[in-house]
Amino acid sequence: MPKRTLVTFPNDSLKEISSEVSFPLSEEDKSLIKDLKDTCVVEGGVGISAVQVGINKRIMLAAHDGELKAFINPVITSVSENNIINDKEGCLSFPGFFTKIKRYNNVCVRYYNEEGDQLIDSYEGFTARIVQHEVDHLDGIVMLDRMHRLDKDKFLRKRKRQYKKIKKVISQMMRSA
């Protein structure tokens, strides 16, 4: 099970827009999809995008019907504008952090599978939430961009305090070395 290293906030590469993948898939892309599956399973995730392992390609996985499904070059083509759910979300790139995010309860997505077949499928509920979250990653959008302003401010203040504590500990270690 080759696990890839996760890119975590505040790494700027999470804000980059991913490039489309061409077909037939290269061996490198096939290997990336397998590694994404392994990484997602090992990390206990329900979805992952290539950008989260430092690869800016439009490849993502989302849990659906008990398995991780690959979506290549996904595009959300329609949403249920009158059915928005505000629910908790986590992210492998924001370890241990969960916050409420508004998402459409139903989405229709056009994508390619690993064989290069173009598909159009509809998803609802939790799977729709995962698909939207991972497509956001491919578009350079992170949870912070979707959070309510007050939650975002609270998160950034907490993160700043954590960095100050870490900096202080490192400084003390350097002095005693």
Each predicted region: which residue ranges?
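Positively charged
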Residues: 1-177
